[in-house]
Design a protein with these regions (language model features):
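Helix-start (N-cap) detector for alpha-helical repeat units in TPR-like alpha-solenoids
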Residues: 43, 77-78, 125-126, 159, ...
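TPR-adjacent "capping" and linker segments in tetratricopeptide-repeat scaffold/adaptor proteins
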Residues: 2-5, 29-47, 173-196
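Short coil turns that delineate tetratricopeptide repeat
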Residues: 40, 74, 121-122, 156, ...
């Protein structure tokens, strides 16, 4: 081993590894100053690399890059949101492969970052829009409705020109989901309790809850699906 054989790229890679995994290192600020001085566009480069790796389903490397980004600039809310979205997507990948325990662990990590970005000041509308879909996936319809309503409240004063085509689509999609939740009454406590009980193996209690819900909500297909799931 010859120290003079170490390249700048290897040193920077080592620093990024520290930033990703050693959050309590006393020298983090020093390491950040080094890497941003040598590579002023490092955040942009890493973001592009992480997104590309995610698209190619190279999840291990993508996760390492996202964690390094978060370590490089812990106060950047956009980075935290991207990390939440990545963890959310990786949880889906694990669940689709039948690895439910791994999926649950990644969902828990994703929720932690979603919660963090939803508490950011000034508020970031996209944090609530994306968190809404995360809650929908978990059948937490009341939380989803709250998130989408907050997104609409944060964007209500923006014109269509300011929002752009994608922003207008998001507003319309958020309103559509809110209406569906309200019309089907699936943010009702009985529906949520039934889902939680059945998914935790307490089918008898869950079936009682969903039958009570169906008395006044007989046209809600989600409820009939939940009933069938409990009877399986």
């Amino acid at each position: 081993f010859e120290p003079n054989e170490i390249t700048t790229e290897q040193i920077l890679a080592g620093i990024l590894t520290v930033l990703a995994y050693d959050k309590k290192n006393d020298n983090l600020d020093y390491y950040r100053s080094i890497i941003t001085k040598v590579k002023p566009d490092i955040k942009k480069e890493l973001c592009e690399a992480a997104i590309l790796k995610t698209k190619n389903e190279d999840f291990d490397l993508a996760e390492e890059i996202f964690l390094a980004l978060n370590g490089l600039d812990p106060e950047d809310v956009a980075i935290k949101l991207n990390l939440a979205l990545f963890l959310d997507q990786r949880a889906d990948s694990y669940r689709n492969s039948g690895l439910n325990e791994d999926a649950d662990a990644y969902d828990a990590d994703a929720f932690s970052y979603y919660e963090d970005v939803m508490n950011a000041e000034p508020p970031l509308p996209d944090a609530f829009f994306n968190a809404g879909f995360f809650f929908m996936k978990q059948h937490k319809y009341r939380e989803a409705k709250d998130a989408f309503e907050t997104f609409l409240a944060l964007t209500c004063d923006a014109s269509d020109d300011e929002l752009g085509e994608n922003g207008v689509y998001k507003k319309e999609r958020a309103q559509e989901i809110i209406s569906n939740i309200s019309n089907q009454n699936i943010d009702d406590e009985s529906f949520k309790a039934a889902y939680d009980l059945i998914s935790s193996g307490q089918e008898e209690k869950g079936l009682e809850e969903i039958k009570n819900f169906l008395v006044n909500n007989s046209k809600v297909w989600n409820a009939w699906f939940l009933l069938g799931w409990g009877l399986r």
